[in-house]
């Protein structure tokens, strides 16, 4: 199943429109190219409708939010919805400021998202409509563990029903859920938290999988999460004594570029809940 999702991205080469943050825009571009998709980054309101129209998917990321891009996000989202394109929201650091939470809530209210992806602190804040997160990182008190996993799976399913979107929570343990089914994913490595943009890359990457696998968006999201986690494991194994987080980032992108469907199926660690 996962193999087909990966191969569909390579075969269809979806064009993904990213209104993302300028800290990680280069990494998002490269991860999309590595998986076989094509990226475009455009956020001026005078062209977003045209750009969105020629694309297959839209990735909205509020990491470096500003008044100019908020309007562009709404216009691009409405256009993508009208054309039935895949749309993903990454509410980066949503609880860090009033502007972020207000913007994220308005985006969810006015745009139909296929997937909302974030760490557990971001997802909980968005669910509550208020709160705080530790910058763009998950609060340690919110960590998903084996002890609270059942509780968080139930939470993700209910939130999916409330928001009419797949809820994709990334962390040491990942949860991907719609209102009926949930998948728990155990791939990845702790060093992934030591590079800026690993979450942003995952969002862009997941949008490509959604765009290329529109018939099963839940499985497409699971496949993207597994593939990124597997790539993290492969990248970590390549690291030498003098390699650091910059080398790891490059190895991560290389692992996505070289990954086969068979490799993904063999290394993916996930279960249905």
Give short role names for the model-derived ranges.
Residues 3, 22-26, 42-45, 67-70, ...:
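Electropositive phosphate-/nucleotide-binding environments in soluble metabolic enzymes
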Residues 230-273:
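Charged C-terminal helix
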Residues 69-118:
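Glycine/small-residue-rich loop that forms an oxyanion/phosphate-binding "nest" at active or ligand-binding sites
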Residues 185-196:
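Short pre-catalytic strand/loop immediately N-terminal to key active-site residues, enriched for Gly-Thr
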């Amino acid at each position: 199943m996962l193999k087909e999702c990966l191969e569909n991205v390579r075969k269809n080469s979806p064009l993904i429109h990213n209104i993302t943050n300028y800290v990680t825009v280069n990494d998002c571009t490269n991860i999309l190219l590595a998986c076989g998709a094509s990226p475009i980054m455009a956020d001026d309101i005078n062209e977003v409708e045209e750009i969105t129209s020629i694309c297959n998917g839209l990735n909205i990321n509020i990491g470096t939010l500003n008044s100019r891009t908020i309007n562009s996000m709404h216009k691009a989202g409405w256009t993508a919805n009208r054309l039935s394109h895949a749309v993903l929201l990454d509410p980066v650091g949503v609880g860090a400021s009033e502007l972020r939470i207000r913007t994220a809530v308005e985006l969810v209210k006015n745009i139909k998202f296929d997937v909302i992806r974030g760490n557990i602190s971001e997802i909980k804040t968005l669910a509550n409509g208020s709160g705080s997160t530790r910058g763009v990182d998950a609060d340690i008190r919110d960590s998903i563990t084996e002890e609270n996993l059942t509780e968080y799976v139930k939470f993700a399913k209910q939130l999916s029903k409330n928001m009419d979107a797949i809820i994709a929570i990334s962390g040491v343990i990942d949860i991907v859920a719609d209102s009926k089914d949930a998948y728990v994913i155990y791939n990845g490595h702790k060093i992934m938290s030591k590079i800026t943009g690993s979450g942003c890359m995952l969002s862009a990457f997941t949008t490509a999988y959604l765009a290329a696998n529109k018939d099963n968006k839940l499985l497409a999201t699971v496949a993207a999460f597994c593939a990124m986690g597997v790539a993290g494991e492969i990248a970590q194994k390549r690291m030498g004594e003098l390699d650091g987080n910059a080398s790891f980032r490059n190895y991560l992108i290389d692992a996505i570029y070289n990954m086969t469907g068979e490799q993904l199926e063999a290394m993916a660690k996930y279960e249905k809940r």
